[in-house]
Amino acid sequence: MDEGTGLQPGAGEQLEAPATAEAVQERCEPETLRSKSLPVLSSASCRPSLSPTSGDANPAFGCVDSSGHQELKQGPNPLAPSPSAPSTSAGLGDCNHRVDLSKTFSVSSALAMLQERRCLYVVLTDSRCFLVCMCFLTFIQALMVSGYLSSVITTIERRYSLKSSESGLLVSCFDIGNLVVVVFVSYFGGRGRRPLWLAVGGLLIAFGAALFALPHFISPPYQIQELNASAPNDGLCQGGNSTATLEPPACPKDSGGNNHWVYVALFICAQILIGMGSTPIYTLGPTYLDDNVKKENSSLYLAIMYVMGALGPAVGYLLGGLLIGFYVDPRNPVHLDQNDPRFIGNWWSGFLLCAIAMFLVIFPMFTFPKKLPPRHKKKKKKKFSVDAVSDDDVLKEKSNNSEQADKKVSSMGFGKDVRDLPRAAVRILSNMTFLFVSLSYTAESAIVTAFITFIPKFIESQFGIPASNASIYTGVIIVPSAGVGIVLGGYIIKKLKLGARESAKLAMICSGVSLLCFSTLFIVGCESINLGGINIPYTTGPSLTMPHRNLTGSCNVNCGCKIHEYEPVCGSDGITYFNPCLAGCVNSGNLSTGIRNYTECTCVQSRQVITPPTVGQRSQLRVVIVKTYLNENGYAVSGKCKRTCNTLIPFLVFLFIVTFITACAQPSAIIVTLRSVEDEERPFALGMQFVLLRTLAYIPTPIYFGAVIDTTCMLWQQECGVQGSCWEYNVTSFRFVYFGLAAGLKFVGFIFIFLAWYSIKYKEDGLQRRRQREFPLSTVSERVGHPDNARTRSCPAFSTQGEFHEETGLQKGIQCAAQTYPGPFPEAISSSADPGLEESPAALEPPS
């Protein structure tokens, strides 16, 4: 630098700044353990010295901003600063302090952000995190579809006047939506980013769940007409009005009867959306897990996912039983017992809860990549390269296997062209073993579908318990028994190492035993209640038969009763009446327990003791008249008459046994299905079985079971000319029809699994006979070594290891004897036997 230039740096001085910075960095190179573990401390510790030391006579001071430019430079011969200039040491201190703080904050914030992003990336690319999301997704879907909906279906029927066949249609729409998109999702989703497809499916499920709850918010509020103090005679018999007749129900424009099909359409659309959204869960989710984890961990991950799916229905039944114990409108609670048929439970809140939970679960699904990177263990650093190679090898092995499978499938005619699809379908369906086991599995699946859908309704109507308790009993009995049965069936197959033939025999035995156990369900039940005007007459005239059902009689024909609201009362004669008006009751009052008491009931004139009819008198009722004490007319209390039936516990025990034995056959059916086709045909065979199950079991079963159940109804809801839900069933007919149809399906399944077992046996026996014809046994040693020979079974040493093995069983036996008893005699036998034994394989060759 020229002396006349003062403090202005020249071109050569600007080049000295990087050298000074490098010198500062060289003095800061040594790192400590703390600086390595905490990079922020390392960057903050490397600072140039602000004061000259004794060892540095001509120090260079510099202030470098964030852009790397030098603000102040002092050469080896510094000039004295001007009086107006600030102190050099003070300026340098402020500059370095500001730069150090900015560097510290910027570096620390950047490192913290990078660390957070790295942690988030590691979490969202971990197969275990995907497994957790997949488990919750499967759990919520199974909870809502297989458990919660079945537990609240009877409540929805009463609220929106649905028949059992219509509610069965709602259940079937889930599988309809599933069947519509399964080919599209499986084909395009398998080649795309599968977690994204799962997330979109979760969105559809959430929207469908919210849509299912929409009728509660758009329908008129549910109202119950109760007697109050302002109108004490409302709903009672107006005996003074001789011209009063039965009044038809009023039909306002916004009534539920006029909008009946609107609500049904909303339910159907919601179920179809849920079915479409559920398709990727069981088609893309398992394949994504299997393709992105090690082969030895794949089965464990899939087992955890399916266990969560199995727990969903149980929790769904329990959740439904809990929620429908509350009134449907929390803002307007009523004081009604759950046994009152007018009580409607809170059915809609569970769908909103499932929708919210599904929204929370699917957000991480959007972030998972198309392919997860291999996961390595951090603790074992020495084996890092080995682990990486093993993971890559596993993934390469899976891809190679898939490519080889595609080549084999293409060579057999599968997957080449869409036009080959009919030929492939005919090839699969012409396999009698596969066809028989698929039809048997379809019949069993139809029974399971009928049980899951309508068993809460059966328990509620058969034993007269609230819908909430029926749902809880179903969740406690059905789901655990099915889970234990499936696990036991799989354990038996693994423990005994059963093949296709033995697995078919196990399934046949389980089907036969469960068919016999069905007989217990017919005899364990209750009798129908005596409902005045429906299954028992009002008066005791000369004829005690019921030629037709009529709610009116001589005792209530002039009361002007309304018949659109079912408000049962129990008369002192042990008969249940439709409402207090039809019982002929004139006065009412509240008891201390909250139960309403009705007096002066003209239809309850005498106490009738009903005895069971004798054989041949099923249509007649034997009535014993006993005069009522204290008053001429009878009295009644609100609610149905209690039934003396104590068979609920035995029924639940027998139901557990039947479900358990039926579930034991499911793993056997799957094994027979996989073993009955070639390895290359298995994916297409499972797809064909999927279509058979949906079209023959899952879709039609709820509809025709619901239609058959409707035939047992003895009291229908009538609202605005629309026949709504069933108020009372003939529970005896319900029991025989329901379990009779299920037993018929069980018998059909037994026949088909027997045919599947016989077809396997026929094929194996035919193959064995063909081998015997092609390779006849000509020598004594071969006959002794044959597995069917008695000597071979008693002495395994003589059995052969193969058809063309050089060392036969007889030769091994001679060598064993020579080693055990050494001497000239065994050696002579061995040497003389060798030439003959060497020729034995030639005898197995087919004759020319």
Curated annotation (Swiss-Prot):
This is Solute carrier organic anion transporter family member 5A1. Glycans are attached at N228, N241, N469, N550, N590, N597, N730. Gene3D superfamilies: 3.30.60.30, MFS general substrate transporter like domains. It is found in: Cell membrane. GO terms for molecular function: sodium-independent organic anion transmembrane transporter activity. Its main location: membrane. Residues 150-168, 221-260, 330-344, 450-469, 522-651, 710-742 are extracellular. Residues 24-34 have a biased composition (Basic and acidic residues). The chain crosses the membrane at residues 129-149, 169-189, 196-220, 261-290, 310-329, 345-369, 428-449, 470-493, 498-521, 652-674, 684-709, 743-760. Disulfide bonds join C555-C585, C561-C581, C570-C601. It is a multi-pass membrane protein. Residues 1-91, 821-848 are annotated as: Disordered. InterPro entries: Kazal_dom, Kazal_dom_sf, MFS_dom, MFS_trans_sf, OATP. Residues 1-128, 190-195, 291-309, 370-427, 494-497, 675-683, 761-808 are cytoplasmic. Residues 40-56 have a biased composition (Polar residues). GO terms for biological process: sodium-independent organic anion transport. Keywords: Cell membrane, Disulfide bond, Glycoprotein, Membrane, Transmembrane, Transmembrane helix, Transport. GO terms for cellular component: basolateral plasma membrane; intracellular membrane-bounded organelle; plasma membrane. It comes from Homo sapiens (Human). The gene is SLCO5A1. Residues 549-603 form the Kazal-like domain.
